[in-house]
Amino acid sequence: MNRRSKWLWIEPITGSRKRSNFFWACILFLGSLGFFLVGISSYFGENLIPLLSSQQILFVPQGIVMCFYGIAGLFISSYLWCTILFNVGSGYNKFDKKKGIVCLFRWGFPGINRRIFPRFLMKDIQMIKMEIQEGISPRRVLYMEIKGRQDIPLTRTGDNVNLREIEQKAAESARFLRVSIEGF
């Protein structure tokens, strides 16, 4: 939901709380928990989970490896759940014509840099860039080129946005900021 007036435009950015992230975090957690429990079951010689038989798995080569993969998967799963819990990457883009300032706000992991809040002057914005790569894994990213700085992404690099939407968003941004558009 964009909030837009003649002088102010606030565009919310979704973070890591997406259905796909919930899906993969659940799958990874359940799979790695299964691996870990089968490895532990092979050590004790009993089935801790009735559905997962560990009778033919020897502990020394296979059980240890399954425990290791299970623990590694649980660590990766906990990282995914932390990104979902803290909603890393969410925030907003705020364009204020009255003050002549562009503010980009994003949430990060807890700590000193939890709030990422760079500010730029509108007069320093040179153009809006679109990076479009087609192929097996298409990449469509919108950048803001600022004088004396690196290009700042306005869209997430992992978002699967179709070409029409990214072009429309680039046109809206360029029209509001009164800058040109470049595609590469």
UniProtKB/Swiss-Prot annotation:
One of its GO terms (cellular component) is photosystem I. It comes from the Eukaryota. The chain crosses the membrane at residues 21-43, 58-78. One of its GO terms (biological process) is photosynthesis. InterPro entries: PSI_Ycf4_assembly. It is found in: Plastid, Chloroplast thylakoid membrane. It holds the Pfam family Ycf4. Belongs to the Ycf4 family. Seems to be required for the assembly of the photosystem I complex. This is Photosystem I assembly protein Ycf4. It comes from Pinus thunbergii.
